[in-house]
Design a protein with these regions (language model features):
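Intrinsic-disorder/low-complexity peptide segments enriched for small residues
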Residues: 6-9, 33, 59, 68
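Regulatory hinge/linker segments at domain boundaries
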Residues: 1-21, 72-81
Length: 82
């Protein structure tokens, strides 16, 4: 799914951050602990990012985060790679 540049520009810094953390596999609770915010706030940021990017679910948000380089893909040569 393509997202126009305007939609990407609408994301706040925090929405980009939580989308990236979700892409790294973190739950809302883990994101909240990492950013020292409440789980409800983490969920709100995820939801708003999904709406702005037109993602129908968290999996699509993660795919869009990688596709539009909100996060870098994991390094397959890393010792922590699956």
């Amino acid at each position: 799914r393509q997202v126009n540049a305007g939609a990407l520009a609408q994301l706040t810094e925090r929405e980009r951050e939580v989308a990236g953390l979700a892409a790294y596999g973190m739950s809302n609770h883990e994101i909240a602990e990492y950013l020292v915010i409440s789980p409800a706030t983490a969920k709100t940021h995820i939801s708003r990012a999904m709406v702005k990017l037109g993602a129908r679910d968290r999996a699509q948000l993660v795919a869009l985060a990688y596709q539009h380089r909100l996060v870098d893909p994991p390094d397959p040569t890393s010792p922590t790679a699956p």
